[in-house]
Design a protein with these regions (language model features):
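N-terminal secretory signal peptides that target proteins for export/translocation
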Residues: 1-12
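Low-complexity, Pro/Thr/Ser/Glu-rich flexible segments characteristic
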Residues: 35-52
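Sec-dependent signal peptide recognition
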Residues: 13-20
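Short, low-complexity, Pro/Ser/Thr/Gly-rich segments in the mature regions of secreted, periplasmic
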Residues: 214-232
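SH3/SH3-like beta-barrel superfamily modules
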Residues: 55-98, 134-216
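C-terminal motif of bacterial Sec signal peptides marking the signal peptidase cleavage site
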Residues: 25-27
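Short alpha-helix capping/helix-loop boundary micro-motifs
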Residues: 126-133
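Bacterial signal peptide processing site
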Residues: 29-32
Length: 232
């Protein structure tokens, strides 16, 4: 009986000592069960990258780049980012480092054909084993957009150009430079069978656009936008 009385006297004390611990365990259990209901945290950088990957603008830029690579014959170590790009015969050591600029909008790179007898636009850079073929001949004064620059060291030796309608270039409006360089007759190596060259979107041209590689000395390159050609 003495033992029974001893236990009964101490039971409230044990209960009071254990109650805070029991409440703490209960709270932890409730927190663990509720945690999965919270939405996952996404970093701003991850969200931005995902939005860019699925945005129409990003896809359009990638499409333009892929089209330019195919038309120009340029090879890139990283085609998606347009890095490590070359044109020519790498195996023979006869090639050029290439900088790409697919867009021909307000920030585009423009020039005019300066040679008196015009210039052929070639399907490949003339290098060892290239067997370059003329796609068309541009007359003196033809306005072109430069989409790629082929360099030996730091010196531009070839440009990949596309002849575009001058009236589709916003910078040409009321610009005297586009009187000197504009639309000129184009001699094609084959009869055009598709749509004429036109702007599908600002800076993006589709249809039968005369395009190809030309020597750097055939052009007057606009050094400050489309305002004035660089001095010879």
């Amino acid at each position: 009986m003495a033992l029974s009385c001893f236990s009964l006297r101490r039971l409230p004390v044990l209960r009071n000592a254990l109650l805070p611990a029991l409440l703490a365990v209960s709270a932890c259990s409730a927190g663990e069960s509720a945690a999965p209901a919270a939405p996952p945290v996404t970093s701003a950088a991850s969200a931005s990258a995902a939005a860019h990957a699925t945005s129409p603008g990003g896809a359009s830029g990638n499409d333009r780049l892929a089209t330019l690579l195919q038309a120009s014959g340029v090879q890139c170590a990283d085609a998606h980012m347009a890095k490590g790009c070359t044109a020519g015969n790498v195996d023979a050591g006869d090639f050029y480092d290439v900088e790409l600029s697919p867009a021909c909008g307000n920030t585009g790179f423009f020039a005019g054909v300066a040679q008196a007898n015009g210039v052929d636009v070639l399907d490949a850079v003339p290098t060892t084993g290239s067997n370059a073929i003329a796609r068309a001949r541009l007359a003196q004064g033809q306005l072109v957009c430069i989409q790629a620059i082929g360099r030996a060291g730091q010196t531009p030796l070839y440009y990949y150009v596309i002849a575009i309608p001058a009236d589709t270039v916003a910078q040409c409006k009321n610009n005297p430079a586009c009187g000197t360089y504009g639309d000129r007759p184009i001699q094609r190596s084959s009869t055009a069978t598709g749509d004429s060259c036109h702007a599908a979107a600002p800076g993006q041209y589709v249809g039968e656009c005369a395009q190809g590689w030309v020597g750097a000395d055939a052009l007057d390159v606009f050094s400050n936008g489309i305002e004035s050609p660089a001095p010879a």
